[in-house]
Amino acid sequence: GYNLLIGAADMGTGCDTILAQMLAENMECSVDNVAVFGADTDASPYDSGSYASSTTYVTGKAVELACDKLKKQMCRIGAQLLGCTPEEVEFQAGKIVNPATGESVTAAQVGCKSQLNSDEAAEATASHASPVSPPPFMVGMVEIELDQLTGLVTVLDYMAVVDCGIPIN
């Protein structure tokens, strides 16, 4: 499985689940194979805050970048196990595969190799920042009654609609 250390605090935004889903999609595994460790100031990376959709965009991009690094690292380690060069292998469906020979090793085998008699641990860290926060799209509508003589405004109805885009969680 994969361990995901994040600095975002899940305050009802669902970021733990969203980021685990993003890792699972990038690493081509089940979300059940992802353990999320978040908001531990002794161990977690810095995060500017968990609010609106910014965690999905900003921290999610960092997760994607870390997955890209990890795949390359896993390909290097997997190539050692397969006795070939990293250029000869690909990351496919959670395995390191040599398409020319059809041989493959699992992510679990790569993880074990990285921890036993190896000078390279299978781990990756990435950061991502954005100069602007992604804008939310929202509209609010109000129906009022106006007494033109007194200026009294009475709110009869109010509706707000937020476009969340494509829901991830």
Residue ranges: model-predicted function:
Residues G1-N169:
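Cofactor-binding beta-sheet edge motifs in enzyme active sites
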